[in-house]
Amino acid sequence: MPGINGAGPSNFFWQWRTDGEPVTEREHDSSRSASSANSPELPPPASPAESGRQRLLRSSALSRQTREWLEATPARVQGATPPAEARQSPEAQQAERIVQELVRGGADLNNVRTMLRNVMDNNAVAFSRVERDILLQHFPNMPMTGISSDSVLANELRQRLRQTVRQQRIQSSTPARLADSSSGSSQRSLIGRSTMLMTPGRSSSSSAAASRTSVDRHPQGLDLESARLASAARHNHSANQTNEALRRLTQEGVDMERLRTSLGRYIMSLEPLPPDLRRALESVGINPFIPEELSLVDHPVLNFSAALNRMLASRQTTTNSPELPPLASSAESGRRRLLRSPPLLSGQREWIEQSMRQEAEPQSSRLNRAVRLAVMPPQNENEDNVAYAIRLRRLNPGADVSRVVASFITDPAARQQVVNDIRAALDIAPQFSQLRTISKADAESEELGFRDAADHPDNATSCLFGEELSLSNPDQQVIGLAVNPTDKPQPYSQEVNKALTFMDMKKLAQYLADKPEHPLNRQRLDAKNIAKYAFKIVP
C-alpha cells in the first residue's frame, strides 16, 4: 500500500514505509551490486536500539497504537522517506490547499502564521476579513474555542506556512528599509497595534537612567525581522481597508459626525447602533456586531472608529471658514452688551451668564432639571453620560455625584444607574498613582512602539477608545494594558505579560464602569486587580 498514517503517543502524525512501497535508491544500489557479484552477503548487524524494537514488535502484548509507532520509528531514523505523493497525509494536503486559498485571496501569510500561533497559545489575534473567512471554512470552532495545540491540521498548516514564507523571503528583493518606514506607526490601527505588540520586533537602545522600571525586551526565540515585516504589512492592509470604507461612506452621504457619536456610544456603553448606520457599515464590509467570545480589541469596528475620529479631526483643523453667527434676540443682545460692560460685579455676571444658558435650553429640559451647577458646559455629541458627569464633577469641585447627575439627566429613574457607573469609574481612577511604571524611552522602543502626540503629530499612538495619546495632555492618564497579569513587584516583561496596548486610563475606567471586562481577553477587570495588568507611562 502507498502509505499509512498513524497517531503516535503524543498525538502527532508519523509516517512509515510498508513492504509494498518502493525501496530507497541506496537499498536498490546495494542489492544490484550484490547480485552482480553473485556473492550473497549478510546484512549489517542491527543496532541495539533496532534489535530492541524488533523484539518489541514480536511481542503479542503490544497495543495497536504502540506497534504502529514502533514501525514508524525506523523509517524516520534511517531517512528512508517515501515519495512526496505517499509522504503527504490528508491533513498535509488540506494544509497545502489552505495556503493556496490564502495566496489567491491576497492574504499576508506571515501574519496568518503568527496569528495562528497566537490562537493556539490562547493569545489575542487579528486576522483580516479574507484570512478569517478562509480559516473558518477549515476551523469552524475557532471563534468559540480557539484551536488546540494538538490539532494535526493546525500544526501541518503552520509548517506549510513557515516553508512558504521562507520561500517568499528568498525570492523577494524588497529592501528591509521599506518596511522600517512604515513599521514605526504602531497602533495606527487598533487591530494592527495589538498584534504588533504580540510579535515584538527588534530591540532599540534606550537610556537606562531614564527608565524607572527595567523592561525585559529580549525574550528568547523571536524572529525579529519577520515581526517588523508582519507589522508593516498588517498596518498597510488594515489602513487600506479602513480608508476604502470611509471613502465609500462619504460618497453615500452618511452623516459622519452622527456615525462617530453612535460608534462611540456602542463601543463604550453597548448602546445599539441605529439600523440605518448598521446597514451602512455592513454595506462597506464592516460588521459592527461584537460577539461575546471575541476580544474587543480584535474587532475591526475599533480600527474604523479610530480612523473616523482622525478624519473628522483633520477636517475640523483644515476647514476654518468663518461663518456669521445667527441673529440674536433683543434680550440676548442686551445681555451680551451687559457682559462687555466692565463695572459688572461677579455675582451679576454669573447671573447673566446663567440666564443666557437657560434661554438656550429647551423648555422641557428647564422644567425637569432639578439642580444647576456653577460651571456647566454643554455635553458633546460623542460624550456619554458617565464621561460628561465626570467632566462636570472636575469643573465643580465638591459637587456630589448624585447632584452632578441630577443636573443633566431629567428622568429620575435613570439617574441611579449612571451614579453607580460613575462611582465604579471613580474607584478605578485613583489606582493610577499605584501602578508600576514604564519610562517613555522604553515605551517608544520598536517592540512597544508608543508615539507621543506631542512629538509625533502625524503618527501618534491612538487610544484603544479613539483619541491620540500624549503624556503632556493633563486630561489623560496614559497606561499600557497587558494581556497577562503579574504581581506588582515584577517589572513589565514582554515574554510574560504578552501584548501591551496603550490607552487613556480615564477612558478605560468609563468602559469598565459599564462592563468590568478586560478589553483584550474578556477576564474580569476592576479596581481590585487593575494594578496587575496596567503599567503607567512616565516621562
Swiss-Prot record:
Coiled-coil boundaries: none
Per UniProt, the keywords (alphabetical) are:
Hypersensitive response elicitation, Plasmid, Secreted, Virulence
List all Low complexity biased stretches: 181-194
Signal peptide (from-to): none
The primary site where this protein sits is: secreted
| InterPro entries, A to Z | E3_ubiquit_lig_AvrPtoB, HopAB_BAK-bd, HopAB_BAK-bd_sf, HopAB_E3_ubiquit_lig_sf, HopAB_PID
The alphabetized list of GO BP terms reads:
symbiont-mediated perturbation of host programmed cell death
A Pfam entry, by short name? AvrPtoB_bdg
Q: Where in the cell is it found?
A: Secreted
Induction is noted as: Transcriptionally induced by HrpL.
Start-end of Basic and acidic residues biased regions: 18-31
Note the Gene3D superfamilies from the entry: 1.20.1280.110, AvrPtoB, C-terminal domain, Effector protein HopAB, BAK1-interacting domain
List every stretch annotated Disordered.
Answer: 1-93, 163-220, 230-249, 315-336
Q: What is this protein called?
A: Effector protein hopAB1
